[in-house]
């Protein structure tokens, strides 16, 4: 047996409570393992530990599995009647049988030895307060990211002197200010609602000298270029009237050059009461020769004008947690995204969650983390992270023509086995953002653009369909993007109306095994009912037998799915009819 391919631990994404009654258990094996059984029971079923008892447990097969590139992910859900569980595994290959315990592998012969210890896996107790709980509304949310300065100018009276004319087309410079503001967002809420959007994610809106606002000057003040507190309150109120949620962007890894505590440090040096609010290794700082790159102090990247905040300092944690609490209590925001979330202290994240969930248990706390983020997703820090690995994997399938539909299956399964199921339900799925090249700019073929969107809309989690160019309102109103808007809106409304598209259960058939560039997967429901997604990424047309109700199609003629064609259909099993 391929022993190196086997792995399990009785915590994190391998063993965790889904709710107060159900425990999910996962184990990875090599492809040589053909069958997995779990032997499980209550730890005290045979008496108190250490009393010479013989504990046997009950054997159950694990039948659900997902294929990874080099391993198989086996999964089962059990209901421990007394909220605790003791277990081990039986692994069967073509010609071998091994038992897998916490301390390793045991042969059948060793199992028969009288008195030999069995160091079983144990989940001690399913404490309700330890169960990761995520906001249920998020999986039903389609987010629209707004970079305020480039979205819509609704109040010219607050335009700064250096504002430039709105540019519907062409490139923009990062430092240019176009005058987009909160009033402009309010004006366009009905447009977003009609599109199918029910969540708005705003990049930072606090006072800052830049247009992007990730170099905050005053965390307690709305940037005057965007409006004021009353305007933002009105935005939240008007959004809520339309059943739309609002999420703010919090920048607590670093601040801007003009943040008052940093200015105090620059003026007073080591005598400043705020000196320990930052990560300074040497004083004075030599800005002329790159103080950050010389290691004199830590910053975001190596930008000297974005000093890194010391979230190890209790005073810093309290200051920013109080700021966030005010956003929730005063503005009634629904979500908070943390910028550069993997660099702030875990203690800050834990304290922030405890405070905000006390105010609003249903608030959505999202971290910007580009890699595997399990250490932040154990139920006591973030609800979710931005699912960059999924978006990049989907785009890679179109970029790398050597990838097959089997590779696609492997990568989707990898993305959805990294975390717990309740986390997967609320991951922030995206194909682009203000930090990346826009998908439409990167994908010259409009058909491929729609194909990638169709795949993403069928994934668990919430979705963001919107680099920093101005919204081309004149072109939109003139109908220049009519087809694109209609197609995206159809996908959004389909996602909203079809529960199976938001579900967790995937199945990857092999109906197109002879054409490796055809993506096919099913989102499973009850009694053979499922939604099937077929995307033809090959260079040839394919035949797709008629079946079920067509929910969405593009470049599909009768039973022929053309190159870059999309077919989404629902098949209802006899038991659901």
Labelled PLM ranges:
Residues 141, 147-198, 205-325, 330, ...:
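Substrate-binding/active-site clefts of carbohydrate-active enzymes
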Residues 29-31, 85, 557-577:
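C-terminal beta-strand-rich structural cap/linker in extracellular carbohydrate-active enzymes
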Residues 138, 154-178, 188, 410-413, ...:
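Loop/helix patches that line or flank the sugar-binding groove of alpha-linked glycan CAZymes
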Residues 236-244, 254, 259-269, 329, ...:
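Active-site-proximal helices and loops of the catalytic beta/alpha 8
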Residues 32-81, 92-106:
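Aromatic- and glycine-rich beta-strand/loop motifs that create alpha-glucan
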Residues 1-33, 111-129, 134, 510:
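Non-catalytic, glycine-rich low-complexity segments
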Residues 142-144, 200-202, 246-248, 336, ...:
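Hydrophobic faces of well-ordered beta-strands that scaffold small-molecule active sites
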Residues 27, 146, 192, 202, ...:
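Conserved, mostly hydrophobic/aromatic
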